[in-house]
């Protein structure tokens, strides 16, 4: 029987990895003040999140093996998981600067913390490099070492392409709904979110077990990318229709001029008059204008449109899962676990 990891088990691996990273920096005779800074960044940025991406690696390895992991297997899987969390930290530190964000996980964003400022850009680079330090330390002799390096490079670049498309499509200070389209939306969510959040953890698990055949990777990608797209569309839906007490935050997509699924669906069906309402009210930091857009979303019955979309896409994903070829070591349960976590979630 496979066994799910807990956040406590997963977090317990980090101090050992942190020590490896600090030792690596020490090997260059980095002065103590700068070493302390690196330690502070390593503790402020990768830690404190839900670790869904990172924990998906040991969970997937256990499902692939259909049994609980040995101590060594767990350590390897959790180390790969922490690399996804370091990748996420690198993206978030950078993203918060680009978006001029204020808070992250209930704290001021790293670049807004005392004395940090634009040093955060270099800290982000160092978080990215930590991935490759850990890969070399623990996977140098693994048959998939080069594949793992290439997977992280490829996933990083894919995420950066998604981010570029997002930044150029929806600048916060320049509202132009002509920039938006469902094709662009789909590109942004697939590249900015789906690859690193959904495909990467399973690809890492397959590589750890030497099961990353072209067929297994392709089958995983064909399910996990649509799953990641569904997850982001659900996020956009919850931003407007979710209850703040459930999702833990107040939605800001309308005020932030986000290229969200809802605004794209609205643009696709709006009359010229309704489009004019959107153009005059979307992306404005104004409560009254936000309410006008919310009312338009209700008038256009976007909630029902989402619920219909959800049933359709989940049906397609379930069909793909049912048709998985398990002869090469892939397991349907890996994908069922992902779907179960997000289907009909309220936060």
Curated annotation (Swiss-Prot):
Pathway the protein contributes to: Isoprenoid biosynthesis; farnesyl diphosphate biosynthesis; farnesyl diphosphate from geranyl diphosphate and isopentenyl diphosphate: step 1/1; Isoprenoid biosynthesis; geranyl diphosphate biosynthesis; geranyl diphosphate from dimethylallyl diphosphate and isopentenyl diphosphate: step 1/1
Binding site residues for dimethylallyl diphosphate: 104, 192-193, 232, 249, 258
Key word tRNA processing present: no
Alphabetized InterPro entries for the sequence: FPS1-like (IPR039702), Isoprenoid_synthase_dom_sf (IPR008949), Polyprenyl_synt (IPR000092), Polyprenyl_synt_CS (IPR033749)
Keywords recorded for this protein, A-Z: Lipid biosynthesis, Lipid metabolism, Magnesium, Metal-binding, Steroid biosynthesis, Steroid metabolism, Sterol biosynthesis, Sterol metabolism, Transferase
EC number assigned by the record: 2.5.1.10, 2.5.1.1
Domain of life: Eukaryota
Cofactors, names only: Mg(2+)
CDD domains the UniProt entry points to: Trans_IPPS_HT (cd00685)
Cofactor binding note from Swiss-Prot or TrEMBL: Binds 2 Mg(2+) ions per subunit.
Family named by the database record: Belongs to the FPP/GGPP synthase family.
Function: Farnesyl pyrophosphate synthase; part of the second module of ergosterol biosynthesis pathway that includes the middle steps of the pathway. ERG20 catalyzes the sequential condensation of isopentenyl pyrophosphate with dimethylallyl pyrophosphate, and then with the resultant geranylpyrophosphate to the ultimate product farnesyl pyrophosphate. The second module is carried out in the vacuole and involves the formation of farnesyl diphosphate, which is also an important intermediate in the biosynthesis of ubiquinone, dolichol, heme and prenylated proteins.
Record-given protein name: Farnesyl pyrophosphate synthase ERG20
């Amino acid at each position: 029987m496979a066994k799910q990891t807990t956040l406590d088990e997963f977090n317990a691996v980090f101090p050992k990895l942190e020590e490896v990273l600090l030792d690596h920096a020490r090997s260059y005779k980095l002065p103590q003040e700068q070493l302390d800074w690196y330690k502070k960044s390593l503790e402020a940025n990768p830690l404190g999140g839900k670790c869904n991406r990172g924990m998906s690696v040991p969970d997937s390895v256990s499902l692939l093996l259909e049994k609980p992991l040995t101590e060594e297997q767990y350590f390897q899987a959790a180390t790969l998981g922490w690399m996804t969390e370091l990748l996420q930290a690198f993206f978030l530190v950078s993203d918060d600067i680009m978006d001029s964000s204020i808070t992250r996980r209930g704290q001021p964003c790293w670049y807004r913390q005392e004395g940090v400022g634009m040093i955060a850009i270099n800290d982000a680079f160092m978080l990215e490099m930590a991935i490759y330090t850990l890969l070399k330390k623990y996977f140098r002799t693994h048959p998939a070492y080069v594949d793992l390096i290439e997977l992280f490079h490829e996933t990083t670049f894919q995420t950066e392409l998604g981010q570029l498309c997002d930044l150029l499509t929806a600048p916060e200070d320049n509202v132009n709904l002509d920039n938006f389209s469902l094709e662009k939306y789909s590109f942004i969510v697939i590249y900015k979110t789906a690859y690193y959040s959904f495909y990467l953890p399973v690809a890492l698990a397959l590589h750890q077990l030497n099961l990353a055949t072209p067929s297994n990777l392709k089958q995983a990608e064909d399910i996990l990318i649509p799953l990641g797209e569904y997850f982001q569309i659900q996020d956009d839906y919850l931003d407007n229709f979710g209850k703040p007490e459930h999702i833990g935050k107040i939605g800001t997509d309308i005020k932030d001029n986000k290229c969200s699924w809802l605004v794209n669906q609205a643009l696709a069906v709006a009359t010229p008059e309704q489009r004019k309402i959107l153009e005059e009210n979307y992306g404005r930091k104004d409560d009254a204008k936000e309410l006008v857009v919310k009312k338009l979303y209700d008038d256009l019955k976007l909630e029902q449109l989402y619920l219909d979309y959800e049933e359709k896409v989940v049906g397609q994903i379930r069909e793909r899962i049912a048709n998985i070829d398990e002869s090469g070591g892939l397991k349907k349960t890996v994908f069922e676990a992902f779907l179960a976590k997000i289907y009909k979630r309220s936060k």
